[in-house]
């Protein structure tokens, strides 16, 4: 009986922990129809001002040897009453492509990124990065860090 009570207690605590994980996103709005809410949790860094986060949104499309890009703008919004930022990618245009000939080369599935304004963000591990994007857009990210070495400009 005691083992059963302990097991029930552990199950209750684990479901509470799972609910607490979901509660972190409560103040953020639900995704609109046709959109997904994608969340990035960053690890804590010692000097977070020396880091940036690049949001790399895109689609996996059939592509040839040409350089391809999608167009879009990642817009920052503020959650009313909370002051938290979230980001929205409303429209994705394209793909745009260079026009090289690719004789004899088969097309293959490749991740094609969205390029435009607003994709480089300040690093803040205290809050999640919440991105609303169309359902067919995948959100990836890359961490950038500043070099310790600082160069001096030369007067000319």
UniProtKB/Swiss-Prot annotation:
Keywords, alphabetical: Disulfide bond, Periplasm, Protease inhibitor, Serine protease inhibitor, Signal
InterPro entries membership: Ecotin_C (IPR027438), Ecotin_sf (IPR036198), Prot_inh_ecotin (IPR005658), Prot_inh_ecotin_gammaproteobac (IPR023084)
Keyword Signal tagged: yes
Protein name: Ecotin
Source organism: Pseudomonas aeruginosa (strain ATCC 15692 / DSM 22644 / CIP 104116 / JCM 14847 / LMG 12228 / 1C / PRS 101 / PAO1)
Signal peptide segment: 1-19
Site (described: Reactive bond): 99-100
SUPFAM superfamilies per record: Ecotin, trypsin inhibitor (SSF49772)
Stretches of the chain forming a coiled coil according to its record: none
Gene that this polypeptide is encoded by: eco
MF term (GO), any: serine-type endopeptidase inhibitor activity
Subunit comment: Homodimer.
Protein's UniProt keywords contain Manganese: no
Example of a GO cellular component annotation carried by this entry: outer membrane-bounded periplasmic space
Location (main, coarse): periplasm
Protein localization: Periplasm
């Amino acid at each position: 009986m005691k083992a059963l009570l302990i097991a029930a207690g552990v199950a209750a605590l684990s479901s509470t922990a799972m609910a607490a994980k979901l509660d972190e996103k409560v103040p953020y709005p639900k995704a609109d129809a046709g959109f997904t809410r994608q969340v990035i949790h960053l690890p804590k860094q010692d000097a977070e001002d020396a880091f940036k986060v690049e949001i790399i949104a895109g689609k996996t499309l059939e592509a040839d040897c040409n350089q391809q890009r999608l167009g879009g703008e990642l817009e920052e919004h503020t959650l009313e009453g909370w002051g938290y930022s979230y980001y929205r990618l409303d429209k994705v245009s394209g793909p745009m492509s260079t026009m090289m000939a690719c004789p004899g080369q088969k097309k293959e599935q490749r991740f094609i990124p969205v390029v435009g304004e607003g994709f480089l963000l300040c690093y803040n591990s205290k809050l999640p990065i919440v991105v609303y994007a169309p359902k067919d857009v995948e959100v990836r990210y890359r961490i950038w860090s500043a070099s310790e070495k600082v160069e001096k400009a030369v007067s000319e």
